[in-house]
Amino acid sequence: THYREVVIETYLGATTHASSGLRARPVPGQGYPLDMHVECSMAMRRSQPVGTRFLIQARVKAKDGRPCLYCYYGNDYKVLTDEEFRQHASRWQSSSNER
């Protein structure tokens, strides 16, 4: 199973019995569907305001028959500044232009 760097952001979604509604999704430009579920640490998500972008190590796995991004809850992560996010986004743009 291959882990790779993925930038995610938190948002408020539907509340379920399993969550407070604080969810995470991949940001655009990385080749993942924007509605793809991200399974990651609730403590990480709660540590910053809604809308924060995190750089995580994640892999694609199946959950309930659908692909999702999985990040082990004990993995390190980085809170991205706006400038760091722009740097990552420009790399995605460069690699998509090379295809």
Question: What kind of feature is each model-predicted range?
Answer:
Residues 60-92:
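OB-fold/S1-family single-stranded nucleic acid-binding modules
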Residues 23-28:
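Short, acidic/hydrophobic/Gly-rich beta-strand patch recurrent on exposed beta strands
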Residues 15-17, 30-31, 55, 62-65, ...:
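Catalytic phosphate/metal-binding cores of nucleic-acid and nucleotide-processing enzymes, i.e., regions
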Residues 41-56:
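Short nucleic-acid-contacting surface segments enriched for D/E, G, S/T with interspersed K/R
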Residues 1-17:
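Structural detector for short beta-strands of small beta-barrel domains
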Residues 30-40:
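Short, structured beta-strand/loop micro-motifs enriched in basic residues and often containing a Trp
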